[in-house]
Amino acid sequence: MKTRIEHKIHAIADVLFRDMKDGKLDNEGVGLLAGQTGIIIFCKHYLQVFPNSEKEEILEGFLETYFDKLTSEIGLLTYCGGFTGALEGLKYLNRERLLEIDYSDVEKNYRELLQTFAINSILNGNYDYLHGGLGIVKYYCDDAEFVNRALEALEQTAEKGDRIYKWKSSLGLDRGVGYNICLSHGMSSIVSVLSLLGSEGIDQKKRDRIIRNTCNYILSQEIDPQQHGNYFPSQSLENDPEQINHQSRLGWCCLLYTSPSPRDRSLS
């Protein structure tokens, strides 16, 4: 007997394979979280569990279109919807033996462009993990020379206080710039990505200093959970000091305000 989750998975797969067959996904970007690479990963896992020759044939046709786009078009370069995410996805597909593809030439051709984009993004205040420089730093985490340049750019652009580093960045459409401690687009992603950087040749003292001082700022934003329903604001207390209610979606950018959920015993 199928579970509700299994029914939902089949429903998602049916829509994706139908749209692939009809060419409706051909114009999507190549990204991992918002693009064709994420779709391919889902479909590869789906066919592992639920083999279907017709769907496998549809996916093969889609892969041809995907690789043509990957090798012939320069679109977004970012982790979420662009080329860096596609490379991360291909690395995963190869590692999990879901796909065997040599993309080293493509990666080599884009390396300088991606790394230059990452450094310039950080220097211009766009360190954003999903849509800026940090996603590229994560992908090239073993390239010590590049990582050290990224660390230098981060420290150079930080606003420095008493054992505190903080950065201003875009807060979204019509919201200007401000401080953001969240994971997807904010300073928590700086801590997360830099914590992965352990390869030989990386300036560990600088890395640790940035992590420590960024954590100090994040922790300085803690609020009373009894009053607000959560421990931290969604972005920063500094952006709107007059705001009384700090409902939070700290963990991810796309969730609704879900802070009451952990206290709902019916969800246990």
Predicted regions and their residues:
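Structural helix-adjacent loops and short alpha-helical linkers that scaffold large soluble proteins
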Residues: 1-10, 46-60, 93-108, 141-149, ...
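Long, well-ordered core segments of solenoidal/helical folds
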Residues: 5-24, 57-74, 102-123, 149-168, ...
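Non-membrane alpha-helical segments in proteins
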Residues: 33-49, 81-93
